[in-house]
Amino acid sequence: MMNAAFQQTATDSKTGDAPAILEMRGISQIFPGVKALDNVSIALHPGTVTALIGENGAGKSTLVKILTGIYRPNEGEILVDGQPVTFASAQAAIDAGVTAIHQETVLFDELTVAENIFLGHAPRTRLRTIDWQAMNSRAKALLTALESNIDPTIRLKDFSIAQRHLVAIARALSIEARIVIMDEPTAALSRKEIDDLFRIVRGLKEKGKAILFISHKFDEVYEIADDFVVFRDGRAVGQGRLKETPQDEIVRMMVGRDVENAFPKVDVAFGGPVLEIRNYSHRTEFRDISFTLRQGEILGIYGLIGAGRSELSQSLFGITRPLSGKMMLEGREITIHSPQDAIRAGIVYVPEERGRHGLALPMPIFQNMTLPSLTRTSRRGFLRAAEEFALARKYAERLDLRAAALSVPVGTLSGGNQQKVVIGKWLATAPKVIILDEPTKGIDIGSKAAVHGFISELAAEGLSIIMVSSELPEIIGMSDRVLVMKEGLAAGIFERAELSPEALVRAATGNA
């Protein structure tokens, strides 16, 4: 259904009988050169999970920033319990009962669990000092309600992503949030961790919370959400009940077309060996790994969480050092002690957590894209802005980067466009080997097909690619061969003709 019909019914056709907790009516957000949101109306109801679906750049992130008080819309109004409100700051949104749990949780490693939960609203004694005993006790009660035995007095620095999400949810409960926004919460979770998260979400529903669930994973959307809203090009183009709407229809709403070939793999005539790894071992994470990567080949690496896939990739890039083993690049033995060594050798790495490890978020797009290539854009120690812009523009156009300008901070981009910046900055160095760690994590279905197509193009041009992925369709659809890892060991290398979900899962789990 199209936007006009949706706008008329968005606030009164939702599933629940209860009035909406929060409504957005006619919201528009305008930035220089782009209308990020165009006359958007949505309603969130108590005890209901509403999935917000759309391609990267569709306006989802802008909507979340408005709801959390980071942006103030140019047009439209927000109502809470039927009363107009203005979120002039993040604190104003929190005071109104709105909280967000992001894909990369905003928590502080050096603070304890309890301190993170009650940051900014810690219980006080009569003397107005922090009541540490009460804070730890309340944090423990919140965690127990979430069926967690996490010690609230320990620091967060060694916590897994799943544990961080749990702390973020406990924080939401501590401020008595009524509207909970979950932005790609399952992106780095195992299936068991996803099941645990969904159990908590269902508990929040029972407590009457209104939940806005943002995800690109349709199986999870259909599992946990009741309703959906689809964004495209800054507009809300469709809404309804998930159980009444086929997935293909939602995809058509998202992209305005049918997406037929999600894995546009190109057959490539491989060249000779480019990277050879022999008996590579790490002190704790992986042991005795060997493989050969040929020119133009896409080598997939698959395994369960904790199998050592990312750790192996990071070691190849020099983030960590191997305990033993040999690395050969184009027939010559090399030693990689640091990422700088790897870059000089022609090996680059696109990390899983792009926001934390791949980008300088406050810096402009063009500077992020040219950081590893400063020797090409400087003369006698002085940077040449025109050359920086020209280099950044070249790869921005090649990757179809969607941004108002190359001078805007990269942190203002959607997740998919941020990923394009990371890939572009490494392509600008003319590498021989590129390692892609979860390259489509947090990317929508339409953009995934585009990224897959670009990966295939790079392979056809002779670039050698290592692709780490936890998504079986991606591994099978894009790889020429697959190295399966299990508990730090190589469980097998499969040729393309041998690839099947059953074979890879059996190898990854040890159930031969």
From Swiss-Prot:
Binding site for ATP: 54-61
SUPFAM superfamilies, per the entry: P-loop containing nucleoside triphosphate hydrolases
Pfam families in the cross-refs: ABC_tran (PF00005)
Keywords annotated in UniProt: ATP-binding, Cell inner membrane, Cell membrane, Membrane, Nucleotide-binding, Plasmid, Repeat, Sugar transport, Translocase, Transport
Membrane-topology descriptor: Peripheral membrane protein
InterPro entries, sorted: AAA+_ATPase (IPR003593), ABC_carbohydrate_import_ATPase (IPR050107), ABC_transporter-like_ATP-bd (IPR003439), ABC_transporter-like_CS (IPR017871), P-loop_NTPase (IPR027417)
Residues forming coiled coils: none
Catalytic activity, as annotated: D-ribose(out) + ATP + H2O = D-ribose(in) + ADP + phosphate + H(+)
Start and end residues of each ABC transporter domain: 22-258, 263-512
Molecular function GO terms recorded: ABC-type D-ribose transporter activity; ATP binding; ATP hydrolysis activity
Iron-sulfur recorded as keyword: no
GO cellular component term, pick one: plasma membrane
EC numbers, comma separated: 7.5.2.7
Cross-referenced SMART domains: AAA
Annotated localization: Cell inner membrane
Job of this protein: Part of the ABC transporter complex RbsABC involved in ribose import. Responsible for energy coupling to the transport system.
Record family assignment: Belongs to the ABC transporter superfamily. Ribose importer (TC 3.A.1.2.1) family.
UniProt subunit comment: The complex is composed of an ATP-binding protein (RbsA), two transmembrane proteins (RbsC) and a solute-binding protein (RbsB).
Protein name as it appears in the record: Ribose import ATP-binding protein RbsA 2
Species this protein is from: Rhizobium johnstonii (strain DSM 114642 / LMG 32736 / 3841)
Gene behind this protein: rbsA2
